[in-house]
Every structure is written in structure tokens, then in C-alpha cells.
Amino acid sequence: MDKKQARLRRARKTRARIAELKMARLSVHRTNCHIYAQIIDETGSRVLAQASTLEAEVKKELANGGNAGAAALIGKRIAEKAKAAGVEKVAFDRSGFQYHGRIKALADAARENGLAF
């Protein structure tokens, strides 16, 4: 099993546990250059809010989308968009990524801006 397959296996297990909770989830994905966050409804069929370093407003503010500062900005934006969509509490889906660095920065920023998980 290679590194990617192991991450996807962890993600599958996490998503199965989150599905039992019957609540919206904050799904995070990262690449070397960008970070993406989505609020997905409890059925898993609809995206309620999304933010990424590919958005035009975000690109203007950042020199690099692949660092902890960019992740913190995305965490702040996703929390604001979630509140606008009426979502206050979510389950955090780190997609099998280690809770460290950019993933942790995004989660901390989202919590500071009023998203509960």
C-alpha cells in the first residue's frame, strides 16, 4: 500500500464515522500549491459553501497558496460562508491528511471565526 492509498483508506473510514453523526462536514483537501475547503450537507449530496486558494479574491491577497497563512485565510473564509449558509456546527473531515501544519491552521482559523467542531 503506497502513501496515497493509505491516506484514501483513512479518509474512507473517517467519512463513514461522520456519516453516522448525521451532520454537515467540513471537508479539506490540500495539494502542494493550494488548499480547498467545502461544507457538505449531512446527506453528502450537496455543497453548502466552499473556499479555496484558487478564488480570485484570495489570489490577490496571497503570494503563495501552499502555506499555513493561506490555509488560515481559507479557514476564515469558509467559516464566514458557512455562517451565511446557516451552518454553525460541523464535523471536521481532514481527508486522511495529518492534523498538522496547513490542515491545523485552517481548522484553528475556522474555529476562531465561529465554526464549531
Curated annotation (Swiss-Prot):
Any one Gene Ontology BP term: translation
Keyword rRNA processing: no
CDD domains associated with the record: Ribosomal_L18_L5e
GO cellular component terms, A-Z: cytosolic large ribosomal subunit
InterPro entries to which the protein is assigned, alphabetical: Ribosomal_uL18_bac-type, Ribosomal_uL18_bac/euk
Domain of life: Bacteria
Pfam families documented for this protein: Ribosomal_L18p
GO molecular function: 5S rRNA binding; structural constituent of ribosome
Keywords, sorted A to Z: Ribonucleoprotein, Ribosomal protein, RNA-binding, rRNA-binding
Family designation: Belongs to the universal ribosomal protein uL18 family.
Free-text function comment from the UniProt entry: This is one of the proteins that bind and probably mediate the attachment of the 5S RNA into the large ribosomal subunit, where it forms part of the central protuberance.
HAMAP family: Ribosomal_uL18_B
Subunit-level organization: Part of the 50S ribosomal subunit; part of the 5S rRNA/L5/L18/L25 subcomplex. Contacts the 5S and 23S rRNAs.
Listed name of the protein: Large ribosomal subunit protein uL18
Species the sequence originates in: Laribacter hongkongensis (strain HLHK9)
Gene this protein is translated from: rplR
